[in-house]
C-alpha cells in the first residue's frame, strides 16, 4: 500500500489512493506531492521533518550501533564494492568501504557488494565490542536469506548464510531494516557514495 502526501495543492493531506491524490493536485500550478510506503513517512514529509533521521535517533537512544550498507558493481572493471556508514550510540560516525574481485561472486553483480557490506559491518561491530546492531539495507535478500524466507542457492548466499551462523552468537540483537533504494535518504546516500568511490579506486 502507498500513501500519497500532498504538501502544496488544492487540498493538503495524506491520501491512500492515486485518484484521490490526483484530485487534490489537478489544475494546481506546481503542486508538491510524493508517495511513501508508510503513513509515518508521509506525515514527516508534510511536517518538513526527516523520517529516517527520527528512526535512527530512536535506534541510537536504544543503544544500537546503526549501519547503513550498500553495494556497487562494474562489469567493465570486473569487480564489486561495498560501502558502510556506521553511526555509534554516542553519535560518532565511522565509514568502511572496499573493493573485491572474487570470480565466484561476480555474476551476482552488486548483490555481492551488498552482502559484503553487511559482513564488514558485523565484523566491525564484533571487533569493537558492540552487542546490538541495526542494519539498514536496500536489497531484501540480505534479511530473507538468513530467515530462510528465501532459499540460499547461489555461492554468495550460501557463503553469507554460513557467515551469519558463525557470527550471530556474538551479538545480543541484530535487526534488519529495508529502506527504499535511490530515495534520497542521507545516511544511505553516504553508503552508496562510499561503495562507488571504492569501485573507482
Where do the model's predicted regions map?
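A short, exposed loop/beta-hairpin motif centered on an aromatic-Gly-Thr core
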Residues: 9-14, 27-38, 128
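Short, conserved catalytic or adaptor-binding loops enriched in Gly and charged residues
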Residues: 24-26, 58-59, 165-170
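RNase H catalytic domain
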Residues: 72-78, 118-190, 194, 199
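Short, mixed-charge low-complexity intrinsically disordered segments
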Residues: 31-55
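RNase H-like nuclease fold core
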Residues: 58-112, 124
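Eukaryotic low-complexity, Ser/Thr/Pro- and acidic-rich intrinsically disordered regulatory regions
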Residues: 48-55, 59-62, 97, 199-201
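A short beta-strand micro-motif
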Residues: 2-10
Amino acid at each position: 500500500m502507498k500513501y500519497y502526501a500532498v504538501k502544496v495543492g488544492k487540498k493538503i493531506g495524506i491520501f491512500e489512493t492515486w485518484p484521490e491524490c490526483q484530485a487534490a493536485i489537478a489544475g494546481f500550478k506546481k503542486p508538491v506531492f510524493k508517495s511513501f510506503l508508510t503513513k509515518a513517512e508521509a506525515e514527516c514529509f508534510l511536517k518538513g521533518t526527516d523520517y529516517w533521521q527520527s528512526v535512527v535517533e530512536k535506534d541510537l537512544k536504544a543503544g544500537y550501533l546503526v549501519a547503513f550498507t550498500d553495494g556497487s558493481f562494474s562489469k567493465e572493471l570486473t569487480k564489486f564494492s561495498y560501502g558502510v556508514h556506521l553511526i555509534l550510540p554516542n553519535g560518532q560516525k565511522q565509514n568502511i568501504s572496499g573493493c573485491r574481485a572474487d570470480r565466484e561472486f561476480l555474476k551476482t553483480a552488486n548483490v555481492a557488494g551488498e552482502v559484503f557490506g553487511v559482513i564488514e559491518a558485523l565484523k566491525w561491530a564484533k571487533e569493537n565490542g558492540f552487542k546490538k546492531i541495526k542494519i539498514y539495507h536496500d536489497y531484501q535478500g540480505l534479511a530473507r536469506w538468513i530467515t530462510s524466507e528465501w532459499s540460499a542457492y547461489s555461492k554468495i548466499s550460501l557463503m553469507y548464510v554460513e557467515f551469519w551462523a558463525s557470527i550471530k552468537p556474538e551479538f545480543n540483537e541484530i535487526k534488519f531494516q529495508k529502506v527504499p533504494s535511490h530515495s534520497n535518504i542521507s545516511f544511505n546516500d553516504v553508503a552508496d557514495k562510499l561503495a562507488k568511490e571504492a569501485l573507482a579506486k
